[in-house]
């Protein structure tokens, strides 16, 4: 049996000094020998998705100690992508994922912790902690802060649901008065929690359920609802049990790499495609798979995208449906149940809470079980009261939405689309692939051709859109915004929001080697690989070049002959792969260090050290 890692610092005469320090943290004689569990929190007052986590770490810690473990809490950083959006702050968002993963590794290995409970929530925090968990491969349970309630505003004598994107779109639309914009702004984000649609944060928290590393309901139970407290209480007890099974019973099946296997990654990506998740999840799953030493690639994502239907449409794809509605329909277990019915999942694999995913679905899928507890759990409703307090309300719907024909979650037979919610496109513009969230693309523009309007940065693209330089039929091309070229691979939520505000949501396309917010919709193609800074063809496009986009056939083509491209490449090699226009962008030492090691989006934008 493997010894408890913590014995390195708690046993033996030579560890008297270390034990003295442990005692100064509150440990007593009877604690030496118990599993030491790291409570990896991410509380910060900067981020609404994390503002309520301060007390939740201690809640988990108390449950760990009541179950016979020793809990030691620390915090990681957390960047709010919405606040960092639209300025140089966004350069730091994706690199923060690596910093979070490293900081978890540093703390856990430096102090020889035996296991972890990861309390995450927003965009880069869950992926960073996931990467660390698979890197360390010690028992872990994920429990996130939960989604925000959707905002509501009275508009033209009716109640309209809102989210963060509505505020951005309205602010750029001259048809809205200042008073209307303020009303939307004040109502869009009413509570603590991760932004209310199927944006990156909620997508990733949902995927932890499919990977088997979190409890049912983790991705969909509202941050404000009292039911969410149970997840934190159970996580504290569960992690002590997992630690004992591994260290005392030599049960390796509880380790994250035994749970998050290749099949589990397939399940997670299948879920992502079916629910129209954020394109950022592709980056994060690819990165996490590399930490787990699993050969899960863009080719696998392409393969899955061709056979998985869209079973659930959530904001930004459908403005009236938010995470609270997904939970009301049975949550992630409800979607996984329909995917299983369609034969699209591997359910023989374990989870942290069940022997197999199949057994978990039998217990938690509301269309399979008559359990009053399960149906009550998924009837949790929004409270409708602005608050930053977790577990502060107990409202419920009268019954769960089990309609799989016209409800929020559909069966394969009644899918929103038999074609998946994400697609990988290949062609001479993206030899290693690029990603489009097809769930947010109108059917009328699944095939699109138009002239490229070149912008060497997100900033210049925003100015171009707002100043009327884009017209219907154009393709906005933003380059040198990849992991290395940005650096940091900025999200392009403002350009897509402004195109929508100008009425071009179905009339233009946007292509970039950067990435998109989970809140983006429309014909938005990102993650173009190789990126411009790596010598990708996107760096050779000239103003007015025609680009052909064919989503049904998974193609993207720059209509320039090979000989001309070769001439341009020779010119660019001589000039250097850098933006044609100087950018007023201060690149710090920290960002330069990230850029020096960053790989392309096709590899998850992970760092690669020189040989």
UniProtKB/Swiss-Prot annotation:
Record key words, sorted: 2Fe-2S, Amino-acid biosynthesis, Branched-chain amino acid biosynthesis, Iron, Iron-sulfur, Lyase, Magnesium, Metal-binding
| UniProt EC number | 4.2.1.9
Q: List ligand-binding residues for Mg(2+).
A: 81, 123-124, 491
Catalytic reactions of this protein? (2R)-2,3-dihydroxy-3-methylbutanoate = 3-methyl-2-oxobutanoate + H2O; (2R,3R)-2,3-dihydroxy-3-methylpentanoate = (S)-3-methyl-2-oxopentanoate + H2O
Kindly give the InterPro entries that the UniProt entry links to this protein.
Answer: Dihydro-acid_dehy_C, DihydroxyA_deHydtase, DiOHA_6PGluconate_deHydtase_CS, ILV_EDD_C, ILV_EDD_N, IlvD/EDD_N
Q: Which metal ions or organic cofactors does this protein require, according to UniProt?
A: [2Fe-2S] cluster; Mg(2+)
Which residues does the record list as N6-carboxylysine (modified residue)?
A: 124
Q: Name one GO biological process term.
A: isoleucine biosynthetic process
SUPFAM superfamilies found in the cross-reference section: IlvD/EDD N-terminal domain-like (SSF143975), LeuD/IlvD-like (SSF52016)
**A Gene Ontology MF term for this entry?**
magnesium ion binding
Give, as in the UniProt entry, the pathway in which the protein acts: Amino-acid biosynthesis; L-isoleucine biosynthesis; L-isoleucine from 2-oxobutanoate: step 3/4; Amino-acid biosynthesis; L-valine biosynthesis; L-valine from pyruvate: step 3/4
- Function in brief: Functions in the biosynthesis of branched-chain amino acids. Catalyzes the dehydration of (2R,3R)-2,3-dihydroxy-3-methylpentanoate (2,3-dihydroxy-3-methylvalerate) into 2-oxo-3-methylpentanoate (2-oxo-3-methylvalerate) and of (2R)-2,3-dihydroxy-3-methylbutanoate (2,3-dihydroxyisovalerate) into 2-oxo-3-methylbutanoate (2-oxoisovalerate), the penultimate precursor to L-isoleucine and L-valine, respectively.
Question: PANTHER family in the record, alphabetically?
Answer: D-XYLONATE DEHYDRATASE, D-XYLONATE DEHYDRATASE YAGF-RELATED
Family according to the record: Belongs to the IlvD/Edd family.
Record-given protein name: Dihydroxy-acid dehydratase
Q: Which organism is it from?
A: Brucella canis (strain ATCC 23365 / NCTC 10854 / RM-666)
Lineage of producing organism: Bacteria, Pseudomonadati, Pseudomonadota, Alphaproteobacteria, Hyphomicrobiales
Point out the gene that encodes the protein: ilvD
């Amino acid at each position: 049996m493997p010894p408890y890692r913590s014995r390195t610092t708690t046993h033996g005469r030579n560890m008297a000094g270390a034990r003295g320090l442990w005692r100064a943290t509150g440990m007593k004689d009877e604690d030496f020998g118990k599993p030491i569990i790291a409570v990896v929190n991410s509380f910060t007052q900067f981020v609404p998705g994390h503002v309520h986590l301060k007390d939740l770490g201690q809640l988990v810690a108390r449950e760990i100690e009541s179950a016979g473990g020793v809990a030691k809490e620390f915090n990681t950083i957390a960047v709010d992508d919405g606040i960092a959006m639209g300025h140089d702050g966004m350069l730091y968002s994706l690199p923060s994922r690596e910093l979070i993963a490293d900081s978890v590794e540093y703390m856990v290995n430096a102090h020889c912790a035996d296991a972890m409970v990861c309390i995450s929530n927003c965009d880069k925090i869950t992926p960073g902690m996931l990467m660390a968990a698979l890197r360390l491969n010690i028992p872990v349970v994920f429990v996130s802060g939960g989604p925000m309630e959707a905002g509501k505003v009275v508009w033209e004598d009716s109640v309209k649901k809102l989210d963060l994107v509505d505020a951005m779109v309205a602010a750029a639309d001259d048809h809205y008065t200042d008073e209307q914009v303020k009303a939307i702004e004040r109502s869009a984000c009413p509570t603590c929690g991760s932004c209310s649609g199927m944006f990156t944060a909620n997508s990733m928290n949902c995927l932890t359920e499919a990977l088997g590393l979190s409890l049912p309901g983790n991705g969909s139970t509202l941050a404000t609802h009292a039911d969410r407290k149970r997840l934190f209480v159970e996580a504290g007890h569960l992690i002590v049990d997992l630690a004992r099974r591994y260290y005392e019973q030599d049960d390796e099946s509880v380790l994250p790499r035994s749970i998050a296997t290749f099949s589990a990654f397939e399940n997670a990506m299948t879920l992502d495609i079916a629910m129209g998740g954020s394109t950022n999840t592709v980056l994060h799953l690819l990165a996490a798979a590399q930490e787990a030493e699993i050969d899960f690639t863009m080719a696998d994502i392409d393969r899955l995208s061709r056979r998985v239907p869209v079973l659930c449409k959530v904001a930004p794809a459908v403005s009236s449906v938010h995470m609270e509605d997904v939970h009301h329909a049975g949550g992630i277990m409800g979607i996984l149940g329909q995917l299983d019915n369609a034969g699209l999942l591997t359910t023989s694999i374990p989870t942290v809470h069940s022997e197999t995913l199949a057994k978990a679905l039998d217990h938690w899928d509301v269309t399979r079980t008559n359990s009053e507890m399960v149906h009550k759990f998924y009837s949790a409703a929004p409270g409708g009261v602005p608050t930053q307090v977790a577990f502060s309300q107990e409202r419920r719907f009268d019954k769960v939405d089990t309609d799989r024909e016209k409800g929020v979650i559909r069966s394969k037979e009644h899918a929103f689309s038999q074609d998946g919610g994400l697609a990988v496109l290949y062609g001479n513009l993206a030899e290693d692939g690029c990603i489009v969230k097809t769930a947010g693309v109108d059917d009328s523009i699944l095939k699109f051709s138009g002239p490229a309007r070149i912008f060497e940065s997100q900033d210049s693209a925003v100015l171009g859109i707002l100043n009327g330089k884009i017209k219907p039929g154009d393709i906005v091309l933003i380059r040198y915004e990849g992991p290395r070229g940005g650096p940091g691979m900025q999200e392009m939520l403002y350009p897509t929001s402004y195109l929508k505000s100008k009425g071009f949501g179905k009339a233009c396309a946007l292509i970039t080697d950067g990435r998109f917010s989970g809140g983006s919709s429309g014909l938005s193609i990102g993650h173009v690989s190789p990126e411009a800074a790596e010598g990708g063809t996107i760096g050779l496009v000239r103003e007015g070049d025609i680009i052909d986009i064919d989503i049904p056939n998974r193609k993207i083509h720059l209509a320039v002959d090979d000989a001309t491209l070769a001439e341009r490449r020779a010119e660019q090699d001589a000039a250097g792969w850098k933006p044609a226009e100087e950018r007023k962008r201060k690149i710090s030492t920290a960002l330069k260090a990230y850029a020096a090691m960053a790989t392309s989006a096709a590899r998850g934008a992970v760092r690669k050290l020189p040989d």
